[in-house]
Amino acid sequence: MANIKSQIKRNRQNEKRRLRNKSVKSSLKTAIRKFHEAAETGDVEKATVLMREAARKLDKAASKGVIHANQAANRKSAIAKRVASFSA
């Protein structure tokens, strides 16, 4: 346990941020998993809707600094490519 007042505050802030980031990452994983499940069943319309939702969550996570912007771009690209393969 820290004795310095500023370090006690930093620990408190870090714990709050860790929990917030964990929540964002969890909802992000859920959105991507739902997209993959819809894509595997072959439901194009549902997959397209879920792709937009996942892309929105990826952008939001990147803007909050939970994940890196390039990681968000790569994941969005991968799911967009998968949706494009349905129509091709």
UniProtKB/Swiss-Prot annotation:
Positions of region (Disordered): 1-28
Pfam families for the chain: Ribosomal_S20p (PF01649)
Biased composition (Basic residues): 7-23
A single MF term (Gene Ontology): small ribosomal subunit rRNA binding
Listed GO CC annotations: cytosol; small ribosomal subunit
A GO BP entry: translation
Keywords carried by this UniProt record: Ribonucleoprotein, Ribosomal protein, RNA-binding, rRNA-binding
The keyword rRNA-binding is annotated on this UniProt entry: yes
Family that this chain belongs to: Belongs to the bacterial ribosomal protein bS20 family.
Its biological purpose: Binds directly to 16S ribosomal RNA.
Name recorded for this polypeptide: Small ribosomal subunit protein bS20
Organism: Salinispora arenicola (strain CNS-205)
